[in-house]
Design a protein with these regions (language model features):
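Bacterial Sec-dependent N-terminal signal peptides
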Residues: 1-23
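Buried hydrophobic residues that stabilize the cores of well-folded domains
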Residues: 20-273
Length: 273
């Protein structure tokens, strides 16, 4: 009995200590047991469909198939192992395959290694992402084929970035760890523990995003860098959201700063488990 109890404690300890990746539903801010999500962008001037996509999820909240139904029609498939971890992504009619492996680190973080493979060719590592115990991305490495200067700084041909978060799990800094580049910084405002406004500071300018109670963006304001204009807002976008009982968006209407509607509308529909 003592060994059984010890084993249970070790299992509990390992699941709480080591990183657990966020589900696709959480990353997409989709609520409830979503089984299928359909998204369509329509140009109201001529009723033409500009974008049409259907995404299917398993009961655990991860993508299993993504169908693009517009002019670039294709189907993206997601394969998982017996532990529910993503191990392969492939496209119908395409010989490109993405393969994933996992490394648990001594500090409790989890590194996901992404390899790209084409038919009759060696696989190549294109990214290594490390997540903390809360499933937050903290280190991002990605293949940098466009490097022109000081390329010897790259780590195995990859650039390296770090993410830093506040106590609510929202990003406050995004930084290049290999090259001298001014980091992108964020300030976050909350109401009752929910993010209601995020300001991004980068390249001397700033962008302000406002969110509703469901976490959906409802306003975007852009301020140009100093020396470009008088420092006032250069553009404003607002969105009117119609949501279902779960708080998922059914209709997304965009308006400019004069409250004039955009010529496109985004509509969503869902199937639930």
């Amino acid at each position: 009995m003592r060994h059984i109890v010890l084993g249970c404690l070790l299992t509990l300890f390992s699941t709480t200590l080591f990183a657990q990746l966020k589900t696709d539903l959480a990353l997409l801010n989709l609520k409830g047991p979503v089984k299928k999500w359909e998204m369509k962008v329509t140009d109201l001037r001529n009723s033409s469909v500009l974008k049409h996509k259907i995404t299917h999820f398993n009961p655990q909240g991860f993508k299993i198939k993504e169908e693009t139904l517009d002019s670039s029609a294709q189907t993206k498939n997601f394969v998982y192992d017996e532990q529910g971890r993503l191990i392969k992504v492939f496209w119908n009619g395409d010989d490109a395959v993405l393969e994933y492996s996992y490394r648990t680190n001594s500090d409790g973080t989890l590194t996901v290694i992404e390899k790209q493979k084409f038919k009759d060719s060696e696989s190549r590592v294109i990214s290594e992402n490390t997540y903390d115990k809360n499933g937050l991305l903290i280190i991002k490495k990605e293949a940098d084929d466009s490097c022109e200067n000081e390329c010897e700084k790259l780590e195995n041909g990859m650039n390296k970035y770090s993410y830093h978060y506040d106590e609510h799990g929202n990003v406050v800094e995004f930084k290049n760890e290999l090259f001298t580049v001014e980091p992108v910084k964020y300030t976050n405002k909350y109401s009752d523990g929910k993010l209601i406004e995020q300001t991004e500071f980068s390249y001397g300018g700033k962008e302000v995003r406002t969110f509703d109670a469901n976490g959906h963006q409802i306003q975007f304001e852009e301020f140009p860098p100093l020396g470009f204009g008088d420092g006032s807002k250069s553009s404003v976008k607002r969105w009117k959201k119609t949501v279902d009982n779960y708080g998922n968006v059914l209709k997304d209407e965009e308006f400019d700063e004069a409250n004039e509607p955009n010529s496109t509308i985004v509509e969503h529909s869902y199937e639930y488990y």
